């Protein structure tokens, strides 16, 4: 099966590579020539465990190709996936200019029945705009070529995207025709041989499903952070509370870990877009609006705890472990670490940082305003306080007696609740975490 993927960002590159791994002939298209040139020599534009190996293998087998020219591949493909960016506008709405640009180019150049599938996260009603843009271009050409539009939202977790794509919980597809449904069934059949979990539905419902899923997960995170903050005030322990409610089969334990807030490319953007969709339709999403407010507040909690613990940070050296918004990625979009760094620098603190993967991304974003270190022990050397912002596995069991010797003072704020209070207090650290008094 011949497939084109427009956009070689996180969603597009992972999707295209996984389709190729299952035997499809895939061409990934991107307008960024530098990105395509790097992919041709095996350089990945993103970090995702296992992706580089998978890309190189499928390029070697001749199943995965890269180009800047969509027109050159349209004659041969049955399906075109649009996986371009939908950055938020100032009002929180999704900017569809790239999505509609793909639709117009599709309409200007198709010569036979082809399906344009939107993989990007887009507001409800986008498919209508995509279809209208294609039809307008066909009318300009004076041709009547059959086509379909479809919605196939992604549900990939950064750091586990390949596993998620190759063994999905479910695949959601919104279609308008039986013909499109048959093509999408054929495409996804190899991924779901034992249990065909493709859920076909109308397109608006598919578009809404993506936003609803991310909003639900974001809600659980903000809910638990709100509970954690109250636990601190009343003397409860959020870990016990989480266990008490997470074992209820109606609730479940996932996404109930208190911390310093969510970030990344999806939750913040999609929550804002869902709120904006409600406003556009005369409805206030009051729960979702609260989710966003709680998260914005929670991103500062590590800073707030630090200043309560040690007072004025001016002239103090603060070591920060973790920069990415979560482990196993270099993504720093909307990362809580950026909020804390900004507050510390404004207060006159000296900030040292370490992240196993996201150091280059941090330099790209904020430059040399912080000191970049080689490892967690180097980061802690000479520090007055140590902050944990990202729960990388390699941070879980540090050699604390070494850290105790190299730190100038002994303040620790655990923003992800992974360290042992008793052990650290026995070593003389002043330790605080989320959701405990």
Residue map of PLM features:
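Structural/interface elements that position substrates and couple domains in central-metabolism enzymes
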Residues: 1-437
């Amino acid at each position: 099966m011949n497939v084109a993927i427009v956009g070689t960002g996180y969603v597009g590159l992972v999707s295209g590579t996984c389709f190729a791994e299952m035997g499809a002939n895939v061409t990934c298209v991107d307008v960024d020539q530098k990105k395509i040139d790097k992919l041709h020599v095996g350089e990945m534009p993103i970090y995702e465990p296992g992706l580089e190996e998978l890309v190189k293998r499928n390029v070697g087998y001749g199943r995965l190709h890269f180009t800047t020219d969509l027109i050159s591949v349209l004659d041969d493909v049955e399906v075109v996936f649009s996986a371009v960016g939908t950055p938020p506008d100032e009002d929180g709405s999704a900017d569809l200019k790239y999505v509609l640009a793909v639709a117009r180019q599709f309409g200007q150049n198709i010569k036979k029945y082809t399906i344009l599938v939107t993989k990007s996260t887009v507001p409800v009603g986008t498919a209508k705009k995509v279809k209208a843009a294609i039809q307008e271009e066909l009318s300009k050409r004076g041709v009547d070529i059959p086509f379909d539009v479809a919605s196939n939202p992604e549900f990939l977790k950064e750091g586990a995207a390949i596993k998620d794509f190759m063994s999905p919980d479910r695949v959601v597809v919104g279609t308008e025709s039986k013909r499109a449904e048959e093509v999408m069934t054929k495409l996804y059949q190899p991924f779901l041989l034992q249990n065909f979990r493709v859920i076909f539905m109308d397109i608006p419902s598919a578009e809404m499903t993506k936003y609803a899923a991310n909003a639900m997960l974001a809600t659980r995170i903000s809910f638990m952070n709100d509970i954690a903050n109250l636990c601190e005030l009343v003397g409860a322990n959020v870990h016990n509370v989480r266990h008490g409610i997470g074992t209820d089969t109606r609730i479940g334990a996932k996404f109930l870990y208190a911390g310093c807030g969510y970030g990344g490319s999806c939750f913040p953007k999609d929550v804002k877009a869902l709120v904006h969709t409600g406003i556009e339709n005369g409805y206030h999403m009051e729960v979702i609006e609260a989710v966003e407010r709680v998260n914005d507040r929670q991103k500062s909690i590590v800073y707030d705890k630090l200043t309560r613990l040690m007072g004025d940070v001016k002239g103090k050296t603060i070591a920060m472990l973790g920069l990415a918004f979560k482990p196993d990625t270099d993504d720093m979009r909307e990362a809580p670490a950026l909020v804390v760094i900004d507050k510390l620098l404004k207060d006159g603190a000296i900030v040292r940082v370490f992240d196993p993967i996201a150091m280059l991304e941090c330099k790209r974003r904020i430059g040399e305003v912080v000191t970049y270190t080689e490892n967690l022990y180097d980061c802690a050397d000479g520090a007055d306080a140590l902050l944990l912002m990202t729960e990388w596995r390699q941070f879980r069991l540090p050699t604390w007696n070494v850290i105790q010797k190299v730190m100038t003072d002994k303040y620790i704020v655990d923003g992800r609740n992974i360290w042992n209070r008793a052990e650290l207090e026995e070593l003389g650290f002043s330790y605080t975490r989320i959701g405990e008094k």
